[in-house]
Structures are given as structure tokens and as C-alpha cells.
Amino acid sequence: MSSFHFYFPSVGLFSFFCFFLVSLATEPHIGLGSKLKASEPNRAWVSANGTFAIGFTRFKPTDRFLLSIWFAQLPGDPTIVWSPNRNSPVTKEAVLELEATGNLVLSDQNTVVWTSNTSNHGVESAVMSESGNFLLLGTEVTAGPTIWQSFSQPSDTLLPNQPLTVSLELTSNPSPSRHGHYSLKMLQQHTSLSLGLTYNINLDPHANYSYWSGPDISNVTGDVTAVLDDTGSFKIVYGESSIGAVYVYKNPVDDNRNYNNSSNLGLTKNPVLRRLVLENNGNLRLYRWDNDMNGSSQWVPEWAAVSNPCDIAGICGNGVCNLDRTKKNADCLCLPGSVKLPDQENAKLCSDNSSLVQECESNINRNGSFKISTVQETNYYFSERSVIENISDISNVRKCGEMCLSDCKCVASVYGLDDEKPYCWILKSLNFGGFRDPGSTLFVKTRANESYPSNSNNNDSKSRKSHGLRQKVLVIPIVVGMLVLVALLGMLLYYNLDRKRTLKRAAKNSLILCDSPVSFTYRDLQNCTNNFSQLLGSGGFGTVYKGTVAGETLVAVKRLDRALSHGEREFITEVNTIGSMHHMNLVRLCGYCSEDSHRLLVYEYMINGSLDKWIFSSEQTANLLDWRTRFEIAVATAQGIAYFHEQCRNRIIHCDIKPENILLDDNFCPKVSDFGLAKMMGREHSHVVTMIRGTRGYLAPEWVSNRPITVKADVYSYGMLLLEIVGGRRNLDMSYDAEDFFYPGWAYKELTNGTSLKAVDKRLQGVAEEEEVVKALKVAFWCIQDEVSMRPSMGEVVKLLEGTSDEINLPPMPQTILELIEEGLEDVYRAMRREFNNQLSSLTVNTITTSQSYRSSSRSHATCSYSSMSPR
């Protein structure tokens, strides 16, 4: 336990602070000539309130040290947030000195390890700030107040309000593969600009692969900066004075709101400590310091950029990444020609096979020395520098392997389909790692005189030892067999007796986290729903029941009411795809059942039910949502839809956006449900496939006119939903008279007359922000334009509602609404009234089959940050 930290023990009913008396200097300014020594690890320069300290920390498990900034008041090993010498630990002879010239120098045995390069720049003093930023300060007369700061040279951590500009990047500690490291920085690709994560090869500074990107910020103006704000939201700010913001992650809980309320009541509450870390496994993860009431404290993860570890390039070195049984961790497999590394630290990683190329270049009889090994359903990440050739007119799969064998520099080749057209990539390196891909085949060049899988380190001595060991084991086969049989019987008995308790543990450890869907048996779901006795509702795809898992966790179980055309494997594949989508405004898919003909989905339970119960209630005000809540729901719903339209790995058209499919949690945070239940479409496809249903009143005109269905159909449905949120009523409501039964026509009239507040739910009695009402109505009418090209994307809708775009022009009246009005609302009303009386239950449109067929390809699995050279 380090003596840097403060401790707060308690005895009986008395609590007191017990501080270890160490020489932590809390001077506000550090003068020229001040020093810190690694041989005196209990000395450090500390911020005014003791939150952060800069000094030397031990580089475990060695006896060397790092110059570091860390959280000074937290128990346990120091949580380091900055270090300039991570790759060059120093001995106990090291010294940090603020020299008389104003230069901050780290030296070890008279050798300079690192310097701030601020000699003769007017530095007068230094200070460790409460924000975690170490500053070298001048005077107003010389070079200004701040001459150098640690925030301008970030390591692997971003602290609240620490700017990450276009010229800066976070860099991880070396990855476990030892071949590379990860970085977070602004990526300029062709005409796009985004915040991205890349894997970089150490020996080749130009070899890198981008495997994750944040929202596209190509169209923003002014300086662009990524920042973690005080509320725990990670965003990109831009424009003059950074007034615009695009969220990478928006924290649903505003800690400052609770903090301010406590302050107003005369209470004290420590601000929440957070850090955003680029870990050496390639994931960008947000942590919050959690002080438990029971006295235990720890860093708790709040958000991660990547949910599937196999989406991270280089996580398995040059091996192939598979998910383990928990679906949360990477399980690394080696290709033919390579073996698991023997040292324990790299037990999951594989040896290199680059020697094949060298041997090939020095061997005259090249083809006779090597052969091709085939690895099914496997693809590889690669960059432009990894590629020898891309062959698009390959005749068959086998030909792709033969092409690699005939090329001396080829290490492997990948065959797959791109928009149903075959391709073959000839690769000279596999540094970025592989992943499972059902649509691809990998061909690996291996030595002809060896069979695989095998251990290339085998020698005669090891073979003799293993042979002798096998002989000894065979002496007692009967005894071993009996012991195994008894053990198996005991395990089987224990499993049967303890099944229910095991289910509860699994649910608590896996289901609640919802990182990946959990497989249930049909009997499991019968038990947790009390034989499907508590009906929550019926939707376009099935019936939903309330259930309880592990005796305490509420879930919603949807039983699909139609037989799916595809088999169990395809169903599970789609379930895993949906389950991998994590967004605060999407309902999490936590589990599934695929047993015989049963197909069920298990979702997180939303205590406040669906949005329609809150905006279409009667004159009673019990369920009345105020305007602020409505507008926040509208914005958040748009963010959720924009996510699966534009940001997730598989582009999805929802096809049934309506209030019944917008669920509300206990904080009235909206979550879109039923996404992905219609067929998924590849990023290169523009038409949705068969088995799609929608609800009348929310369907875009192209459904009726048999035009291609794109994501803009969801935009239309969202526009109709947004109108209903504003008006607090159905767009088509036969309980109104002929003049008012059609809300869009009435609302458009109020918008153009400048009396938009009259279009707001009458129960609110005019209590609403008029500017937001006008904005919502304009966006809604742009969304429901008849011409698809005139509708904005959902990403643009979010910007319009959040106010990060320019002034919204008045949209033209949609043609269908105009024709309806010109036809005469009185006649239309009478006709619809007759239909309403005759067919009360006819509310859904049956299955619509588009003319486009769908066929899966490797391209359909592309992430938004895929390399232009990679089929992924």
C-alpha cells in the first residue's frame, strides 16, 4: 500500500480521518530549482485540494520508476493518468528538476530521458492543478501565463475538460502482441473527418488500421476538439467558442445536477472522478470512481467504444480472434504455420510466420517448398501496405489460393464476395489479426514438408518424453476410466439438482450486463414468465410478456408469432448482431431462445412502458408529460434511430417507428424497441428485404407506390411520430370533428401562421418553449416530404433538433397532405369515418415483399470505420 494516499478508517460509532504524514508538497507554485527524486518516492508535488500529484511511481514488477501524474487521494496502487517516459522507466537515481532556465528535465544518471523543451521561454514557476494538468507558468510581462502543460502531451488517458485537438492523440501502452500500439486521434479519410481508433505497427510507422470511428464531423465549422465533460459525456465540440457539439457518448445521468442540488441544500458532495482510458487491448473505456456505502471503492466502467473485442485489430496479434463462451472475451487461435508462444505473458498469442517469405526469396524451387492450407470462414484486417494485389475477376475459390502459392511475397490470400462479386486479396503480412467471417475463406502459405496443426518446436527429446508419458498413462486406463465415469455421474447429478441456482447466477452475471445475448431454454422462459401469464402487449412481430430472472431482475419476453423462413443458425446470427448494438436509446437484447419451433427474445424491462401511454392519455394529467420531457424524448429517439442507420456495424431499417415501439425507463429516457427484427441490410445495399411490416399512419408513401424502401422510410415515420409528440394526439383521430381530425394539416397551418403554440398538446395549456416547438414542427414536416431525397437523414435530424445546424427553412407542405386538403377534409372525414366504423381492427399493413432479393456478403458486415482496402 503506497504511502502517497490518505485513509479514512472508522471505529465503532466514531469516524475520523487518519492521514499518513508524508512530505507531499501542496505548495500552490513550484519555484525554479525545485527537484523530485526517485529515491524519495514519498515526495511529490500535489494540487491545492490534494486531488492530483506528480512524482515518481514504481514501474511494477521491476524496481524502476515512471514520472507520473496520478489521483493522490485514492487507495491502492496509483492510478496513473500521465507519464512521459512509459517506454523508458528510470532507476532510483533519476531526478525531476525545474531548472533555472525554465526547462523541466527528467534525467537518470546524468542522461536526459525527457524534457519539456522550455529553456529561456519565460518560465517562472510550475503548478499541479486540480484538473490534473501540470503547468509551467510565466508572467504577463514575459510569455503569458501558461507556457507548457501536460495536457498538450497526453499519454493514454483523457481527464474531464482535457482537450484532444486535431494535432493531439492518445497512445496506449504497448499491446500484448508486442508488435504495435493503439491510438485515438482525428482521422482525415478522403472527404470525411472523424474521431477514430487505430492499431499501429511499431516497426512500420505507416502501417496502421482504423477499426472504430465516432460520428462523422466533416461538415462542422471551426476548430474541432474532443473532450470529456464534467457530466461524463464524451463529445466533439466545434465552432466559435465551441458552441456546437456532437456526442460520441452521452451520459444519461447528470452528476452535476445532483451536485448542485446538494449544494443548494447546504450539503457537500464530492465531484465525480472520471477518466477515459485507451487500454492496451485497443478499447477506449470510460471509468468512474465509485465509493460504495460499505466502504469498498473501485473504478467502475461506464462505457466502452467497442463491445465485441474481435472488432479490434491486433488484439490477437497475427492470430485469429474468436469470442469465448461468455461472448465477452477474445479467444485467440493460431493459423497453420504458427504456434502459441511459450511464455505465459503471451499465452494467447501466436508466433510469426514471416520467415516463410524470406525463405521463399532465397529458394529457387519456390512452389515445391510450400503448400497452401485452407482456413474456412476466416478473414483478416489489412491495410494498403499489406496488399500485393487485388484480383476481382477470380474464377473460383481454389484459384485464390493458387495465386498466393505462385507469388513469392504472398503470406496469405483472402477470398470473399463484394456485392456478390468475387474478390481475392493477395497479402504480404497478417500483422493486424484475423476474425471469424462466414463469407470469407483464408489461404495460408505453409511449408510443404510439415503437417498442421503442429508444434514447430517439437524435437526428438520432447517426442521421446511425451511418448514415455503416454505409455505410463496407459498402464492404468481402467482405473482412470472408472474415476472419470464416477466424476461425470456426480457432475450430472449436481447439474440436475442445481440447475435453477445456476440459472440465477448466470442471469445475474451475464443477463443484467447484456454485453451479449444469453441462450435460454424454452422451459427457462416458461418458468420466468409464469407460463406466459402476464401480458404486456402485442406488436407487429409478436406478443410480449413480463418475466423475472434470478428472482429480482425484470425482463420483457417477446414470443415471435410467425415462423421464420431461415434456420436456427441464421436466427442466432441475427440475434447476436442485434445484441451487439449498444446505445443508450436502444432497448438492450439480453437473451433469446431457439428451440424446436420456438423463437423468443428477452429484452430489458422498461418500467414506464411505451410512449403512447404518456402522450395519448385522456384529459387526466396523471400521465401528462411536460414539454421539456417531450422534446428530450424526441431528440433522444432520433439519436437512437440515427445510430442503427449510420453508426452501427450493420445498417438497419426499422420499418415500424411509432410511439408503441418507443419505450421509457424509470428516468423517461426513451429506447427504441423492435429494431433489427426486419431483415438487416448490408451497407452497400439500398433496399430492404422481405418479411417487413409497418403500421398505417406512419408508413412512407413509397410503401404504397411500390418504390424502393430505404432508411428514409424510417425518417418519414419519425416525422409522423414527432408530430404526435408535439400534439399529444394521433395524427388521424376520428374522435375529432372534420376540421381537426387530421393533425398534420392543422399543425402546418398553425406553423405558417406563426401560431405554433396552438398546435401543442392542449393539456399543456401553452406551457412550452415556442422556439423548440417551431423547430420540432419544421423538422417533422421536412421528414414527411413525399420526395425521398428531400427528407433529411436521421443524423441531420439530430443536428437540427439539437440546434447544431443553421436556421431551419420552412418546409413545403407535403404533396399528400396538400392533395388531402384540396380534396376536401369534410368528404375525406366522412369516408374515413365509414372505414373506421367498419374496420376498427385493420391497423397493420401485411407483409410486403420488395422486388429486390438479398444475399449476405462479407461486405455487409462492414464497420463504419472499415479500411478502404479491406473487404470488412
Curated annotation (Swiss-Prot):
InterPro entries per record: Bulb-type_lectin_dom, Bulb-type_lectin_dom_sf, Kinase-like_dom_sf, Prot_kinase_dom, Protein_kinase_ATP_BS, S_locus_glycoprot_dom, Ser/Thr_kinase_AS, SRK-like_kinase
BP term (GO), one: recognition of pollen
Span of domain PAN: 360-447
KW Membrane (keyword) present: yes
SUPFAM superfamilies: alpha-D-mannose-specific plant lectins (SSF51110), Protein kinase-like (PK-like) (SSF56112)
Entry EC no(s): 2.7.11.1
Disulfide bond residue pairs: C310-C321, C316-C332, C400-C424, C404-C410
Ranges where the EGF-like domain occurs: 306-344
GO cellular component, one term: plasma membrane
MF terms (GO), sorted A to Z: ATP binding; calmodulin binding; carbohydrate binding; protein serine kinase activity; protein serine/threonine kinase activity; ubiquitin protein ligase binding
Binding site for ATP: L536, G537, S538, G539, G540, F541, G542, T543, V544, K558
Modified residues (Phosphotyrosine): Y603
Reaction(s) this enzyme catalyzes, per UniProt: L-seryl-[protein] + ATP = O-phospho-L-seryl-[protein] + ADP + H(+); L-threonyl-[protein] + ATP = O-phospho-L-threonyl-[protein] + ADP + H(+)
Region described as CaM-binding: 619-637
Domain Bulb-type lectin: 30-149
Family: Belongs to the protein kinase superfamily. Ser/Thr protein kinase family.
The protein's name in its UniProt record: G-type lectin S-receptor-like serine/threonine-protein kinase At5g24080
Protein's organism: Arabidopsis thaliana (Mouse-ear cress)
